[in-house]
Amino acid sequence: MATATVLEKANIGVFTNTKHDLWVADAKPTLEEVKNGQGLQPGEVTIEVRSTGICGSDVHFWHAGCIGPMIVTGDHILGHESAGQVVAVAPDVTSLKPGDRVAVEPNIICNACEPCLTGRYNGCENVQFLSTPPVDGLLRRYVNHPAIWCHKIGDMSYEDGALLEPLSVSLAGIERSGLRLGDPCLVTGAGPIGLITLLSARAAGASPIVITDIDEGRLEFAKSLVPDVRTYKVQIGLSAEQNAEGIINVFNDGQGSGPGALRPRIAMECTGVESSVASAIWSVKFGGKVFVIGVGKNEMTVPFMRLSTWEIDLQYQYRYCNTWPRAIRLVRNGVIDLKKLVTHRFLLEDAIKAFETAANPKTGAIKVQIMSSEDDVKAASAGQKI
């Protein structure tokens, strides 16, 4: 086992449970285990996690205790958007060395089932996805993980490295939706995934792009990211079809939504909310597509006959596969800039406050990052690379 860096701080993690408690406590592997290489399996490396983003699913596991069939059944560590430094490697690992900066792709697959063997490993029948019960997540100071799922990020900041996970979600959607250069595109929802999808759609050449949300502040934030994006504030009292008319009106510079009006070929649905999915369906052109990235309730009602008579494809996404190298290139080469998305930063020991901030709409939080040291928090907040 090769090691680097003087390790001094104990391992702690951010836990929830069936009672919806949230706390910070000692976590595995222990500091002594990390120093001595105990528990490091063949093919694994130990990572000192330096930055982790809070995902909406983390908040949902805390508040609701489940997402569909994925249920918290005991003490459970959250977090799956992380980057850090390799501090130890198993003897058989040759692709990484202590000191390497990496982003963690948070899955472990079986490499034996049909999805794995056909390259769609996000559908692995035996997947262990970090932070999805019962598999503990990355919100801890040290973690062991297979080297094959640790992607070198070079001189990229750990903060950007942690944002590669939500970017991968967006890239998977853009690719599978078939979005083309010059396509009119609708993005529903200006949360973190919607905003990253907006950046990705712009990079892919979509034009014009309209983004929707119920929060005017988030729409203003979207315009700060992509100044020429058009925005539509969803009206709560209107039907899905009526909101769609408003969306089409925005696509047409206020000239209405009647026959001949420009409609999006692709709608990237990033909320998972039934009314938003329905509005997207009512918005797209004949032969268009509604691509659902957002996670919603187990069952929902959609305008079936609109889908049928307008030949609209309704397509879904589950996580991602084979996206991380591309995501790294896009960020490293400046094609997609994610820095503005981070609005709040907290120390690992202050994770409860971080989660409260992420969960409260009044804070204006977009992406909340949790970092392993006070120096990292101060440096990142000052715009310095960590």
UniProtKB/Swiss-Prot annotation:
Family stated for the protein in its record: Belongs to the zinc-containing alcohol dehydrogenase family.
Subunit structure: Homotetramer.
Biological pathway: Carbohydrate degradation; L-arabinose degradation via L-arabinitol; D-xylulose 5-phosphate from L-arabinose (fungal route): step 2/5
Keywords: Arabinose catabolism, Carbohydrate metabolism, Metal-binding, NAD, Oxidoreductase, Zinc
Binding site for NAD(+): P192, I193, D213, R218, I293, Q317, Y318, R319
EC number: 1.1.1.12
Disulfide bonds: none
CDD domains, alphabetized: sorbitol_DH
Cofactor(s) in the UniProt record: Zn(2+)
pH-activity relationship: Optimum pH is 9.4. Active from pH 7 to pH 11.
Binding residues for Zn(2+) 1: C55, H80, E81, E165
Catalysed reactions, as listed in the record: L-arabinitol + NAD(+) = L-xylulose + NADH + H(+)
Name the UniProt record assigns to this protein: L-arabinitol 4-dehydrogenase
GO biological-process terms attached to the record: L-arabinose catabolic process to xylulose 5-phosphate; sorbitol catabolic process
Temperature-activity note from the record: Optimum temperature is 40-50 degrees Celsius.
Class of the enzyme per the UniProt entry, highest EC level: oxidoreductase
Keyword Cell inner membrane carried by entry: no
Cofactor note: Binds 2 Zn(2+) ions per subunit.
UniProt-listed InterPro entries: ADH-like_C, ADH-like_N, ADH_Zn_CS, GroES-like_sf, NAD(P)-bd_dom_sf, SDH-like
The protein's role, per its UniProt record: Catalyzes the NAD-dependent oxidation of L-arabinitol to L-xylulose in the fungal L-arabinose catabolic pathway. L-arabinose catabolism is important for using plant material as a carbon source. Not active with NADP as cosubstrate.
An example molecular function term from Gene Ontology annotations: L-iditol 2-dehydrogenase (NAD+) activity
Binding-site positions, Zn(2+) 2: C110, C113, C116, C124
